[in-house]
């Protein structure tokens, strides 16, 4: 479940920027 959170965070940050 931690991987999902990390992926979501990275995805949101990467996509946002």
Swiss-Prot record:
Factors inducing expression: Transcribed at low levels in vegetative cells. Under control of HetR. Transcription and translation rises 3-fold by 6 hours after heterocyst induction by nitrogen reduction (before proheterocysts can be identified), descends to preinduction levels by 27 hours (at protein level).
Cystine pairings recorded for this chain: none
UniProt signal peptide: none
Chief place where the protein resides: periplasm
UniProt name for this protein: Transcriptional regulator peptide PatS
One cellular-component annotation, GO: periplasmic space
Function: Inhibits heterocyst differentiation; a peptide corresponding to the last 5-6 amino acids blocks heterocyst formation when added exogenously in culture. Controls heterocyst pattern formation through intercellular signaling mechanisms. In Nostoc filaments, approximately every 10th vegetative cell terminally differentiates into a heterocyst specialized for nitrogen fixation. Seems to inhibit the formation of adjacent heterocysts. The C-terminal peptide binds HetR, inhibits hetR transcription and blocks the DNA-binding of HetR.
Source species, domain of life: Bacteria
Keyword Transcription regulation: yes
Result of knocking out the encoding gene: Forms multiple, contiguous heterocysts with abnormal short spacing between heterocysts on nitrogen-containing medium. These heterocysts do not have nitrogenase activity. In nitrogen-free medium nearly normal heterocyst patterns are established after 4 days growth.
One record GO biological process: heterocyst development
Subcellular location: Periplasm
The keyword Zinc is annotated on this UniProt entry: no
Stretches assigned to coiled coil: none
Subunit structure, as described in the record: The C-terminal peptide binds HetR; one peptide binds to each subunit of the HetR homodimer.
Segments traversing the membrane: none
Keywords: Heterocyst, Periplasm, Transcription, Transcription regulation
